[in-house]
UniProtKB/Swiss-Prot annotation:
Assembly with partners or alone: Part of the 50S ribosomal subunit.
One of the GO biological process terms: cytoplasmic translation
Protein name: Large ribosomal subunit protein bL36A
HAMAP family (alphabetical): Ribosomal_bL36 (MF_00251)
Pfam families according to UniProt: Ribosomal_L36
Organism lineage string: Bacteria, Pseudomonadati, Pseudomonadota, Gammaproteobacteria, Enterobacterales
Cellular component annotations (GO), alphabetically ordered: cytoplasm; cytosolic large ribosomal subunit
Single GO molecular function: rRNA binding
Keyword field: Ribonucleoprotein, Ribosomal protein, RNA-binding, rRNA-binding
Record organism: Escherichia coli (strain K12)
Protein family membership: Belongs to the bacterial ribosomal protein bL36 family.
Function: One of the last ribosomal proteins to be assembled in the 50S subunit, it contacts a number of helices in the 23S rRNA, acting as molecular glue. The simultaneous presence of uL16 and bL36 probably triggers ObgE's GTPase activity and eventual dissociation from the mature 50S ribosomal subunit.
InterPro entries found in the cross-reference section: Ribosomal_bL36, Ribosomal_bL36_sp
Length: 38
């Protein structure tokens, strides 16, 4: 999980979701693409 000021989709499988007020990127194809804004 990378913590970044700016989260972006890194591939076409990445999805942007908002959980508890935190924007996250989840990716089914490449777990290394997981990100959290903070």
């Amino acid at each position: 999980m990378k913590v970044r000021a700016s989260v972006k989709k890194l591939c076409r499988n990445c999805k942007i979701v908002k959980r508890d007020g935190v924007i996250r990127v989840i990716c089914s194809a490449e777990p290394k693409h997981k990100q959290r804004q903070g």
